[in-house]
Structure formats: structure tokens, C-alpha cells
Amino acid sequence: PTQKYHDAVRKMGEYEEQYDLVACSGGDGTLDEVVTGMMKREKKVPIGYIPAGTTNDFASSLHISKNMLEAADTVVNGVPFACDVGVFNQDYFVYIAAFGLFTDVSYETKQSMKNVLGHLAYILEGTKRIFNIPSYRIKVTHDGETIEDEFIYGMVTNSRSVGGFKGITGKNVVFDDGKFE
């Protein structure tokens, strides 16, 4: 089990080569760490995901069962499929890379509050940030065009749900097209 930040990345670096599948159970953050650890390995194997977090956005987008036994059965008996992996500052992601307003909420919300209140704990933590909204000077180059301005939020994602909110990125999210929304 993981106990602290980057435990899963470290454990991925320590496991021996004889495995043909890695299964993880946790939230979006745990999956992110496992993916990061896997991408740093020379030999990559499929990752099975059993969602057990607060919002499980990525699992929801993939229609992975919230029932842990059903999800575990899919990990063992399901068919592996490709999934886009993004990289930002040498950190890998499959769910989201973001900056700005509310991006620290999932990290700053106490686990005890998430255990009791679930998604509502994130909303309550987020309300603390409403009156202190910093901006960031960002330069973005995309499709040959460069935009430079002040932004309060930005994200790149491959999910139909972000922070427990569905529909933010639209319905046409494809997980293996080489593009992020």
C-alpha cells in the first residue's frame, strides 16, 4: 500500500521484471503515480485500475465499475487497450495536467474530510480560494499559433469528468487518439 506522495512511483521502480500486469487500487492520484512509475521503466506492462478514490474521474470516463470486485475481475479477465500518456516537465499523466485556480484542492483536502464527505469535501476546500485568485503569465504554442496572456486556470486532460464535474471537456474524448482535450 501507498502511504505518502510518490510511494507508487517508487514502488513501480522497485518491482521485478517477471510481472506481465500491474494492478493498482486508489484514486486518480494513485493511478497517476503508477503511470509515471511505469513510464520510467524500460519494460512497460499493462496497468489494471481498481477505482477506490473520492471522485475517480478517469475510471468514470472509462466506464470502469465502481464495484471493486467487478473492477478487479475486469483487470484480470478484461482486454487491455491503449491509452494516451501525456508528459509535462518529465511528469507523465493520463488524466490531467493543470495549473491555477482550484488545482491544489485535491492535495490540500484532508483525507479524513474526504472519507466523511466525499466529493463535498473538495467543494468546501475550494470555496476557501474564491477570494484569492492568482493569475499566471503563460505562453502557449499550439498548432503554429502562440498565445501569451494572464490566466487563472489551464488544463490538458483526457477525461470526460474533472474534479467530479462531468461535461467540462465535451463528449468527444478519445483515449487513444494521440490528443488531449
What label would you give each PLM region?
Residues 24, 32, 156:
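Redox-cofactor binding/interface segments in oxidoreductases and associated redox assembly factors
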Residues 1-25, 36-37, 70:
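ATP/NTP phosphate-donor binding region
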Residues 33-35, 59-60, 165-166:
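Short glycine-/acidic-enriched loop or helix-start segments at secondary-structure transitions
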Residues 155-181:
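Internal helical hairpin/lid segments
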Residues 30-42:
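Short Gly/Thr/Asp-enriched flexible loops that form oxyanion-binding sites at enzyme active sites
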Residues 2, 40-156:
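Catalytic core of DAGKc-family lipid kinases
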